[in-house]
């Protein structure tokens, strides 16, 4: 019998979340972001599940894109960070990869490449995140060079990324949008070109309808998790796709004053019943999860107690009416959002999902 720690991935919920993204911006193309192994959910399986409805897919690197091609995914694939070397441009052309262009080195590599067919190019414009992309003035020169190149398919897509779209109280998104729109307006007037546009990440899809342009880029929301720290009407419709599950493997009674686990960082204040669960930081469960982090056992919330080990955690089940070895445990999932666990741990759900190691089997349902 295999170890009972598994990540159950509900593909029906995945498709529902993607349909929500499409419905919120019906005039736009929605590109599922499947980078980082589809946020830990399994890039190939997720892409196959969405292949009938997705016009393209988004990844971080050419290695991820080639993995999808080798798995039989036929849609265009967007490389969000573009190419890292000149030889990747020819590989991109041969495989119908779309390239984000973030700097003049990447721009020149495309313009000067010897390739089999023109490439669809996304011109990254830095409107305020200050991480990647051309400054607006530099983007004019880059756009003109791309426009004049036979290596570039037309129209070119202008793109930017929001820094604070998940903060509804921030003025940063409106400021970035204004900079982007001014660039589009001036470039359209100067060139007469039709410039396709992409702005909306998950938070913008859910809450900033003015950002819904030709292409949108659902990521975190695709996997059923809200990018917001507070409630948001559209985000509340999302269904978590992954359920990290395990089982009770030991039950023991300890006396008041006895401690549990490495460093003895939790001491019972009463006679207690402790259940040991076969999951730990070797399975992606956060080592820094503090005492009191909720764990579901037989559908009931119970507090984590003691240090998280590589392969095990311990949970106080004193208040459970009945618990037995083999009982089902949920670490996060639809009944216990990964965002809640992340909040207890001082991190974000994105990190917990993407750090899920390969030793945890993914089980795909629906």
Predicted features and spans:
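Active-site anion/phosphate-binding pocket segments in diverse small-molecule metabolic enzymes
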Residues: 2-11, 15-18, 64, 83-86, ...
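Active-site-proximal beta-alpha core segment in soluble small-molecule metabolic enzymes
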Residues: 6-9, 13-16, 26-198
């Amino acid at each position: 019998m295999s170890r009972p720690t598994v990540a159950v991935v509900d593909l029906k919920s995945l498709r529902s979340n993607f349909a929500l993204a499409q419905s919120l911006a019906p005039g736009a193309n929605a590109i599922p972001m499947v980078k980082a192994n589809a946020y830990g959910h399994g890039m190939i399986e997720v892409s196959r599940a969405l292949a009938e409805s997705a016009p393209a897919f988004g990844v971080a690197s050419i290695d991820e894109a080639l993995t999808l091609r080798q798995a039989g995914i036929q849609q265009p694939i967007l490389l969000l960070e573009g190419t890292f070397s000149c030889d990747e441009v020819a590989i991109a052309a041969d495989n119908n990869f779309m390239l984000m262009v973030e700097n003049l080195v990447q721009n020149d590599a495309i313009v000067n490449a010897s390739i089999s067919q023109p490439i669809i190019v996304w011109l990254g414009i830095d409107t305020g995140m200050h991480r990647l992309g051309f400054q607006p003035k530099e983007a004019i020169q880059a756009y003109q060079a791309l426009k004049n190149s036979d290596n570039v398919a037309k129209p070119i897509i202008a793109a930017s990324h929001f820094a604070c779209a998940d903060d509804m109280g921030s003025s940063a998104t409106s400021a970035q949008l204004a900079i982007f729109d001014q660039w589009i307006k001036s470039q359209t007037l100067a060139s007469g070109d039709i410039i396709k546009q992409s702005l909306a990440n998950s938070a913008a899809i859910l809450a900033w309808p003015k950002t819904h342009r030709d292409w949108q880029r659902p990521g975190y929301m695709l996997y059923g998790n809200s990018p917001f720290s507070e409630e948001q009407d559209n985000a509340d419709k999302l269904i978590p796709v992954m359920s990290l599950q395990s089982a009770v493997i030991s039950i023991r009674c300890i006396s008041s004053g006895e401690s549990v686990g490495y460093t003895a960082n939790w001491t019972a204040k009463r006679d207690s019943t402790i259940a040991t669960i076969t999951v730990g930081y070797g399975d992606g469960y956060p080592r820094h999860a503090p005492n009191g982090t909720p764990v579901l056992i037989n559908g009931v919330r119970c507090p984590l107690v003691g240090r998280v080990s590589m392969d095990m955690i311990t949970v106080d089940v004193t208040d459970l009416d009945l618990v037995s070895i083999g009982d089902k445990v949920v670490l996060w999932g639809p009944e216990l959002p990964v965002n809640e666990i992340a909040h207890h741990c001082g991190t974000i759900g994105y990190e917990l999902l993407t750090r899920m190691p390969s030793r945890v089997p993914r089980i795909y349902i629906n």
